[in-house]
């Protein structure tokens, strides 16, 4: 037997449903990698004989291996910051009040319109590096801070370039319908026409997006406007997803589920009718505790209903300058448990197996099984629950991406 590398003296949280133990755990395990994929995984005592002289063998010293983490919802490419709005909120202003007065997303739009692709790339690279050091091997990056054709394309080009020049896999999402720009303040329908008739075809022509998203909320786009954009995107061959039920229950999630959305995100105000719609369509529910925490919200997502109806729960950072300037996936694991009362196993599934499903890459990453891409992390922990329990100590020892050691 000949492999490219073998890992021994490790415990593995495979996160695979085919392994009955919590976390899909295999203790005292071994993992073999060949051509960037997992060639063998199981008990070390059952490891087939192999050529130890020609095969690199890594000893984990009892550490834990998990799938590479997947951050399935970020707005990672942007310029500027909104620290001044942070101060305003602490003085009593609400997120909606700031948005309606021309702040919020619109202030970041101005900064992004003025920034060059090179400047945006460097800003994005630093943020991507920060996530990568915590074990993230796949990330989603949205546009949405252009709200005009050229800047939306610019943001997506930068996201694509980050994917080409970084070991982290990048999935891109077109979010032209993120907010109504000031120049269309009294004519939202015309802006929706622009998104559908001009922006979307340009995005498709340059192959800049894997999916499309809309912010469906009272301060943004109605359910009817949202459906128009998502339908056009789906017809153009993109996956679809949605920001929904963050501030109120408009029924956007049920509509998106009917259209076959990969995920609906935020969903603090989602009701049981919406949860049932997600369950029936196989749509994931993406939980964003960073925004919940940073905005000091009090309405929790319907976790018990999601469990009851077996909706896959995803956990993501929502990293952005306004409502979640928290560039840490490990922090989200902790917040998912402490704020939303997920179990540590649910939280880790939300950043591995279920996150892969939300991005449509579940056949390639998210669990550790034979044939899957060899994306995994080695952690200095004694139990997988420790990833959610503790935060701030550098527990990520090594990261393997497609069989290559990329972080030590």
From Swiss-Prot:
Q: Which CDD domains match?
A: Imidazolone-5PH
**Which InterPro entries does this chain map to?**
Amidohydro-rel, HutI, Metal-dep_hydrolase_composite, Metal_Hydrolase
Reactions performed catalytically: 4-imidazolone-5-propanoate + H2O = N-formimidoyl-L-glutamate
- What keywords is this UniProt entry annotated with? Cytoplasm, Histidine metabolism, Hydrolase, Iron, Metal-binding, Zinc
Amino-acid positions noted as binding Fe(3+) in the UniProt annotation, renumbered to this chain: 73, 75, 243, 318
Q: Where does N-formimidoyl-L-glutamate bind?
A: 145, 320, 322
Question: What enzyme class is recorded for this protein?
Answer: hydrolase
How cofactor binds (record note)?
A: Binds 1 zinc or iron ion per subunit.
Q: Which HAMAP family match?
A: HutI
Q: What is the protein name for this chain?
A: Imidazolonepropionase
Q: What is the lineage of its organism?
A: Bacteria, Pseudomonadati, Pseudomonadota, Gammaproteobacteria, Alteromonadales
């Amino acid at each position: 037997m000949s492999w490219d590398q073998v890992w021994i003296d490790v415990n593995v949280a495979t996160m695979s449903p085919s392994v009955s133990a919590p976390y899909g755990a295999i203790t005292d395990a071994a993992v073999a990698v060949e051509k960037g994929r997992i060639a063998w995984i199981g008990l070390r005592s059952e490891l087939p004989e192999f050529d130890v002289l020609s095969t690199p063998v890594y000893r984990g010293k009892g550490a834990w291996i998990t799938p590479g983490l997947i951050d399935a919802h970020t707005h990672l490419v942007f310029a500027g910051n909104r620290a001044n709005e942070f101060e305003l909120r602490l003085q009593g202003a609400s997120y909606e009040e700031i948005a309606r007065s021309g702040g919020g997303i619109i202030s970041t739009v101005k900064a992004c319109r003025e920034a060059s692709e090179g400047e945006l790339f460097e800003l994005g690279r630093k943020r991507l590096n920060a996530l990568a050091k915590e074990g993230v091997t796949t990330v989603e990056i949205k546009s949405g801070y252009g709200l005009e054709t050229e800047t939306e394309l610019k943001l997506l080009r930068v996201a694509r370039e980050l994917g080409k020049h970084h070991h982290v896999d990048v999935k891109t999402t077109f979010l032209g319908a993120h907010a109504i720009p000031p120049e269309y303040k009294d004519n939202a329908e015309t802006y929706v026409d622009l998104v559908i008739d001009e922006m979307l075809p340009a995005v498709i022509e340059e192959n800049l997006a894997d999916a499309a998203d809309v912010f469906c909320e009272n301060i943004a786009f109605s359910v009817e406007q949202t459906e128009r954009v998502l339908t056009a995107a789906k017809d153009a061959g993109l996956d679809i997803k949605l920001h929904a039920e963050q501030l109120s229950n408009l029924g956007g999630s049920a509509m998106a589920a009917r259209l076959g959305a990969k995920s609906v995100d935020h969903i603090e105000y989602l009701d049981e009718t919406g949860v049932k719609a997600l369950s029936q369509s196989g749509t994931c529910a993406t939980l964003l505790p960073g925004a919940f925490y940073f905005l000091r919200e009090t309405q929790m997502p319907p976790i018990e209903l999601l469990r009851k109806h077996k909706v896959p729960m995803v956990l993501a950072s929502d990293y952005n300058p306004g409502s979640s300037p928290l560039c840490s996936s490990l922090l989200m694991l902790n917040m998912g448990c402490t704020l939303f009362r997920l179990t540590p196993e649910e939280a880790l599934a939300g950043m591995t197996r279920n996150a892969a499903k939300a991005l449509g890459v579940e056949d390639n990453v998210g669990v550790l099984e034979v044939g899957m891409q060899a994306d995994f992390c080695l952690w200095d922990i004694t139990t997988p629950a420790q990833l959610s329990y503790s935060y701030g100590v550098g527990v990520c020892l090594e990261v393997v991406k497609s069989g290559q050691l990329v972080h030590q």
